[in-house]
């Protein structure tokens, strides 16, 4: 892993840093990156994520160092202009994610359970659960279930409801256990992944040696078990 990372971080750092480590011209509460091997193929992925705005929207770009040592941005199945899952923790620079692995067409598939909290309208917030997996170099989202929290009552008391993406109504317990039940039905194995997120501003404008240390700090903290 270390050998692969050395080549990968050189690619990310030296030849491609200006592609992803840039200042953005709009305000965001969070703008961070992390390194990981999401699909367990020995090639490092770079995730660059930002979150903020009145709708609390999140957007993430996924990059992969290919076998030729080039950094390429992966395609995704996300809908344009829609909020994407919140991959960063809102409080900590470190995050833990539940992962379910199974075999699809003879290949290992790693499904990361992720959540997205957003303001859908002035009186409605939603909290949805989905999974992300890299399938043939495409970041693929599987939408699972959603919680609606509405404040139409004159006393501003919340009305909460739950449903899956087929529109079937769920209880609170069914919603909270939906991802586990969905993947257990596929006989998937459960794992945990740990990520360390670092502010993009920390790596903008620094020397290559400093950038190497920062990248290594993120990857060294990454774990999967």
For the regions a protein language model found, what residue spans apply to each?
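Surface-exposed loop and turn segments in beta-propeller and other repeat-based domains
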Residues: 13-23, 80-89
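Acidic/hydrophobic-patterned starts of short beta strands in beta-sheet-rich repeat architectures
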Residues: 40-50, 105-113
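Beta-propeller blade repeat segments, especially FG-GAP/WD-type strand-to-loop junctions
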Residues: 57-75, 130-135
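Beta-propeller fold detector
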Residues: 72-80, 141-146
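Short, solvent-exposed loop/turn segments at conserved positions within beta-propeller repeat blades
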Residues: 54-58, 122-125
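Acidic, small-residue rich beta-repeat scaffolds with periodic aromatic anchors
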Residues: 100-225
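Beta-propeller blade termini
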Residues: 29-38, 87-109
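Single conserved hydrophobic/aromatic residue that forms the stacking wall/gate
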Residues: 1-7, 11-12
């Amino acid at each position: 892993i270390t050998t692969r990372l050395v080549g990968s971080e050189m690619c990310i750092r030296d030849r491609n840093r200006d592609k992803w480590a840039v200042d953005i011209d709009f305000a965001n509460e969070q703008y961070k990156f992390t390194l990981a091997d999401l699909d367990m193929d020995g090639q490092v992925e770079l995730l660059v994520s930002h979150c903020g705005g009145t709708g609390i929207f999140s957007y993430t770009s996924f990059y992969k160092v290919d076998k030729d040592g080039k950094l390429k941005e992966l395609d995704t199945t996300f809908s344009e202009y829609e909020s994407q899952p919140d991959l960063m923790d809102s409080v900590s620079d470190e995050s833990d994610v539940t992962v379910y692995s199974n075999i699809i067409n003879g290949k290992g598939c790693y499904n990361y359970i992720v959540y997205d909290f957003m303001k859908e309208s002035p009186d409605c917030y939603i909290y949805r659960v989905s999974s992300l997996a890299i399938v043939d170099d495409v970041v693929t989202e599987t939408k699972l279930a959603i919680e609606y929290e509405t404040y139409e009552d004159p006393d501003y008391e919340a009305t909460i409801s739950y449903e899956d993406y087929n529109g079937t109504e769920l209880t609170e317990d069914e919603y909270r256990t939906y991802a586990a039940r969905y993947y257990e039905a596929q006989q998937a194995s459960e794992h945990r992944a740990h990520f360390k997120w670092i502010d993009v501003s920390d790596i903008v404008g620094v020397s290559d040696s400093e950038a190497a240390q920062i990248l290594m700090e993120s990857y060294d903290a990454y774990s999967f078990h």
